[in-house]
From Swiss-Prot:
It comes from Aedes aegypti (Yellowfever mosquito). This is Kynurenine aminotransferase. It is found in: Mitochondrion. Competitive inhibition of L-kynurenine transamination by glutamine, methionine and histidine but not by tyrosine and phenylalanine. Cysteine concentration between 0.31-2.5 mM increases L-kynurenine transamination while concentration above 2.5 mM inhibits L-kynurenine transamination. Keto-acids as amino acceptors modulate the transamination activity toward L-kynurenine. Its cofactor is pyridoxal 5'-phosphate. Catalyzes the irreversible transamination of the L-tryptophan metabolite L-kynurenine to form kynurenic acid (KA). Also catalyzes the irreversible transamination of several amino acids including cysteine, tyrosine, glutamine, methionine, histidine and phenylalanine. Can use various keto-acids as the amino group acceptor. Its main location: mitochondrion. Expressed in developing ovaries. Expressed at high levels in the head. It catalyses: L-kynurenine + pyruvate = kynurenate + L-alanine + H2O; L-kynurenine + 2-oxoglutarate = kynurenate + L-glutamate + H2O; L-kynurenine + glyoxylate = kynurenate + glycine + H2O; 2-oxobutanoate + L-kynurenine = (2S)-2-aminobutanoate + kynurenate + H2O.
Length: 477
């Protein structure tokens, strides 16, 4: 207490001030150290909590189990590739020229209709005028009266028709037979519904000379072995994408007999139904004895009228099967665009008046595509590829393996050769195709690695450019 006794002297006051300053400095330093220590602990706690919180949120918002294992669609990747490198694009399946003018005019008229309801919601299961037109067409084609209100469903493209069919009929543990190669959405749609896909590949029965898509066949014993009490569904695609195979009556009868034996639903994806080349014939499996009651058939306005961007499709079949699709549709999409449905209805009404005439678009389109098919098959063979000549559709697969010495596959890192080939061709040669291994299940992807898929529904001038690009590439050192 010395500083109190010296309080009244100047020296004492100075000493007192110094001591007080020292005490204040000590207290201040200890306080700062304590505050710093607390702050450090607090920051660490925040970091730990933040890390735990982020991890918890990450786990909570992971992709649902029913979609886990799915990979990025080949279309997402290759559309981006085309946008970046700007090749001549023979990859995606769409025409690069205008659809029938009457369809475009009909859409403009519907959108500009004086009736305000023309641009409002329409009937959820299909615009009345469109389902009437679809009923009239398919009643003729399958030789039975189809009820437009209960046996036809209009969807957002054939994609949604497939989705509604699979979601509406496949339950947990149901087995679904898928023929390979297949349109790439089949497998993930089945898995998302809780189904178990069972695969069987089409394989060429010869390797030399001219190969037709008819030469790609199923092993009937292998197919029969896949059917059992758990089999709910088989998906067929005729005309086929990507091979262009048109299943003949004998092949369809094998499928039909197995479906009847095991009480299995047949989903027939027939979006290329009007693109069948002479002398081949498109046979609808629902017309075979005992098959109407167990078949859902899927079609597409995008393919029928060459209007892929309009995204309108449909399913038709017996009411007992269609009601399941309606339930999925009403709780997923509910209704499709009214003006587009109106325009497509006008398109069907136009073609129904001349259905048996060569001027009918459904009839003329196959002749137009056949010439393009023959030209592509010729120039692919000329440069050393071995094309499979399709019976229908507008795609062609070709074996490029004899040209592998002209391709530097080391520049790409993909696991599959056809991915490396198509990416290298896109970047280095300026021509884009699609890798067919994308259309196979994982165990069978090797079956597509030596092939590339090209679309020949393009302007003649662009097909000629493709031929020139390949000839130049083939002739380079």
């Amino acid at each position: 207490m010395m500083f109190l006794r010296n309080h009244n002297s100047v020296g004492g006051a100075i000493r007192t001030a110094v001591v007080l300053q020292d005490l204040q400095f000590i207290v201040s330093n200890k306080s700062s150290a304590l505050t710093g220590a607390v702050s450090s602990v607090h920051r660490q706690q925040i970091r730990t909590m933040s890390s735990t919180s982020n991890e918890t949120m990450h786990n909570k918002f992971d992709l649902p189990k029913r979609y886990q294992g799915s990979t990025k669609s080949v279309w997402v990747e290759y559309i981006q590739l085309a946008a970046q490198y700007k090749p001549l694009n023979l990859g995606q399946g769409f025409p690069d020229y205008h659809a029938p003018k009457y369809a475009l005019d009909a859409l403009a008229a519907a959108a500009n209709s004086p009736d305000p309801l023309a641009n409002q919601y329409t009937r959820g299961f299909g615009h009345p005028r469109l389902v009437q037109a679809l009923s009239k067409l398919y009643s003729q084609l399958v030789d039975r009266t189809i009820n437009p209100m209960t046996e036809v469903l209009v969807t957002v493209g054939a994609y949604e028709a497939l989705y509604a069919t699979i979601q509406g009929h496949v339950d947990e543990g149901d087995e679904v037979i898928i023929i390979e190669p297949f349109f790439d959405c089949y497998e993930p749609m089945v898995k998302a519904a809780g189904g178990i896909p069972r695969f069987i590949p089409l394989k060429p029965n010869k390797t030399g000379g001219t190969i037709s898509s008819a030469d790609w066949v199923l092993d009937n014993n292998e197919l029969e072995a896949l059917f059992n009490e758990k089999t709910k569904m088989i998906i067929i695609n005729t005309p086929h994408n990507p091979l262009g195979k048109v299943m003949d009556r004998a092949e369809l009868e094998v499928v039909a007999n197995l479906c009847k034996k095991w009480n299995v639903l047949c989903v027939s994806d027939e979006v290329y139904e009007h693109m069948v080349f002479e002398p081949f014939e498109h046979i609808r499996i629902c017309t075979l004895p005992g098959m109407w009651e167990r078949t859902i058939t899927i079609g597409s306005a995008g393919k029928t009228f060459s209007l892929t961007g309009w995204k309108i499709g449909w399913a038709y079949g017996p009411e007992a099967l269609l009601k399941n699709l309606q339930m999925v549709h009403q709780n997923c999409v509910y209704t499709c665009a009214t003006p587009i449905q109106e325009a497509i209805a006008v398109g069907f009404e136009t073609e129904l008046k001349r259905l048996k005439s060569p001027e009918c678009y459904f009839n003329s389109i196959s002749g137009e595509l056949m010439a393009k098919r023959d030209y592509m098959a010729s120039f692919l063979a000329e440069v050393g590829m071995n094309p499979t000549v399709p019976q229908g559709g507008y795609f062609m697969v070709a074996d490029w393996s004899s040209l592998d010495s002209k391709v530097d596959l080391t520049q790409e890192t993909d696991a599959r050769k056809d991915y490396r080939f198509t990416k290298w061709m896109t970047k280095s040669v300026g021509l884009q195709g699609i890798p067919p291994s994308a259309f196979y299940s994982e165990p069978n992807k090797h079956l597509g690695e030596d092939f590339v898929r090209y679309c020949f529904f393009k302007k003649d001038e662009n097909l000629q450019k493709a031929a020139e690009i390949l000839r130049k590439w083939k002739g380079s050192s």
